[in-house]
Swiss-Prot record:
Pfam families membership: QueF
Catalytic function, reaction form: 7-aminomethyl-7-carbaguanine + 2 NADP(+) = 7-cyano-7-deazaguanine + 2 NADPH + 3 H(+)
Active-site feature positions: 46 (thioimide intermediate), 53 (proton donor)
Name of the protein described by the UniProt record: NADPH-dependent 7-cyano-7-deazaguanine reductase
Length: 133
């Protein structure tokens, strides 16, 4: 049996590389409700310096026909770890991919980046119109 620690790529890297935004049918499509997900360990790389950027992602959405599976979203956001991408672009791209996968009634993503060089950045993007719950 091959030791998973000596395989290249490692099992975690393979899981991230093969990740898809898996969704399942909304169990309560007739009821307005919100789902809130926080991902406190998001990382990507600065496109100018290549230094790592760290952020807390906060996703709030009102499901349409599909709900995103939690492990799938974790692996999906981990795929940005080695990508050189701006705060603004990564936040918009993640929202676009989640909207395409779930077709929500409303969705908002906030990326709260750790301060770097005495500058704190928060990027907030949304899609659709929020309904009362």
């Amino acid at each position: 049996m091959t030791d998973q620690l000596t395989q290249t790529p490692l099992y975690g890297e393979r899981a991230i590389a093969e990740a898809e935004l898996i969704c399942f049918d909304n169990p309560r499509p007739g009821r307005p409700y919100e789902v809130s997900i926080e991902l406190p360990e998001f990382t990507c790389k600065c496109p100018f310096s290549s230094y790592p950027d760290f952020a807390v992602l906060r996703l709030i959405y009102q499901p349409g026909p599909r709900v995103v599976e939690l492990k799938a979203i974790k692996l999906y956001v981990n795929s940005y770890r080695d990508q050189s991408i701006s705060h603004e672009e990564v936040t918009n791209r993640i929202l676009d991919d989640l909207v395409a996968a779930t077709d929500p009634v409303w969705m908002q993503l906030e990326a709260d980046f750790n301060p770097r060089g005495n500058v704190h950045t928060v990027v907030r993007v949304s899609h659709g119109t929020r309904q009362p719950c």
